[in-house]
Amino acid sequence: MKPNFLLANLVCVLCLLTSCASPKVVERDASVHSAPIIHAQEFSQKYNMQLDFMKHHFSGMLIVRELPDNEIRILASTYFGLSLFDFSLRNEEFHVNSCIEPMKKKKILRLLETDFKNLFLNGKNIRIKKKNSTFEKRVRGSGFGKSVFYLSEFVSGYPEQIKIKHPWLRLSIQLDKLKEKQD
């Protein structure tokens, strides 16, 4: 009799736990292929850049230009002329022309490669977390490879301010588009 009583109690408890719950639909952010954040053009586009990597802080300028052979050239230098890095993007191929020593690590260069591919090429596996007319937050990856893109101040569909954060690595890049002088 005791085993039947335990079995009946177990069945009742299981029925109570499973039947009283309301159905929940957990809405997840859909991964999408997104358009490039910055459209590289034939003339040089200039951005004020602040790069923080661990205990190193660099301020300077990021210059982006699309060359005639569909190569996108990305150059970062300080205001005093020290070149921080010089990268090339052609289709899906990433090439490091030069890079300063603190950032010349395989994993850091791989992170920068995915960041710049997401900025200038069609981003893959991007989750758009928040979006409205003035702000957008995009997330790619997880763990140490997680990249969070904060886009704001949109003009003609492209952001004027971009902040890229890697929370686990203490690496952040902020880009503010420089206005072209009107004569």
PLM region spans:
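Bacterial N-terminal signal peptides that target proteins for export
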Residues: 1-10
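Post-signal-peptide N-terminal segment of Sec-exported extracytoplasmic proteins
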Residues: 40-73
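Mature, soluble, non-transmembrane domains
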Residues: 21-25, 48-49, 94-96, 102-183
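Short, surface-exposed coil-to-beta transition loops
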Residues: 57-61, 82-84, 146, 159, ...
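Mid-chain, structured segments of secreted extracytoplasmic proteins
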Residues: 73-106
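Short, low-complexity, disordered segments immediately C-terminal to signal peptides
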Residues: 25-34
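C-terminal motif of bacterial Sec signal peptides marking the signal peptidase cleavage site
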Residues: 16-19
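Extracytoplasmic
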Residues: 44, 69-71, 82, 91, ...
